[in-house]
């Protein structure tokens, strides 16, 4: 099995790619490309180089019996955004993955003009930690979630956001 997903399609397709990969008991490979959205993912898939690089070696090895080194490829290959590099691993999730919980907070982050400007905290809230609410869809929502401000299109104005405090070191978010 060769499962190819894209970070930019995580709301639907990437979840299925990863869950399917985890459930398969036979020989399997997982590739997650750096496509930022569905349009870039489709653009990649439409190019011959993509098929020659990702699909043809798989088919040649499994369907034609060609000894092309496919079986020596790493089981997992992930594009790491921000660094624009590929990570190879033998397992998913990566062995070095560390789980960290973030909780929704009633505190405003002050970082973005969104419907709620919410914040995230590593501190677990009290059992009666409160609630937050907002009007959705936004009354001014005429062209989807993208609002327009003095600087032009503002893609988060009509969205709900939760933001952490600035982090003191670089953080890579990769994994389940």
Label the model's feature ranges.
Residues 18-19, 57:
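Active-site phosphate/pyrophosphate- and oxyanion-stabilizing loops and adjacent acidic/basic residues
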Residues 24-38:
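Catalytic histidine neighborhood in serine/cysteine hydrolases
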Residues 7-9, 35-36:
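Acidic beta-to-alpha connecting loop that harbors the catalytic carboxylate
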């Amino acid at each position: 099995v060769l499962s190819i997903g894209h970070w930019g399609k995580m709301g639907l397709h990437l979840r299925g790619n990863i869950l399917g990969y985890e459930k398969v008991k036979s020989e399997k490979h997982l590739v997650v490309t750096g496509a930022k959205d569905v349009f870039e993912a489709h653009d990649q898939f439409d190019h011959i180089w993509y098929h020659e690089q990702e699909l043809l070696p798989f088919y040649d090895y499994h369907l034609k019996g060609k000894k092309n080194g496919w079986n020596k490829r790493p089981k997992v290959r992930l594009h790491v955004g921000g660094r624009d590099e590929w990570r190879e691993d033998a397992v998913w999730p990566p062995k070095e993955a560390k789980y960290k919980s973030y909780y929704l907070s009633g505190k405003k982050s002050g970082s973005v003009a969104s419907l709620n400007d919410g914040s995230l905290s590593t501190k677990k809230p009290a059992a009666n930690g409160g609630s937050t609410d907002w009007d959705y869809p936004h009354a001014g929502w005429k062209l989807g979630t993208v609002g327009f401000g003095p600087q032009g299109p503002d893609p988060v104005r009509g969205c709900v956001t939760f933001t952490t405090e600035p982090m003191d070191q670089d953080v890579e978010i990769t994994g389940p």
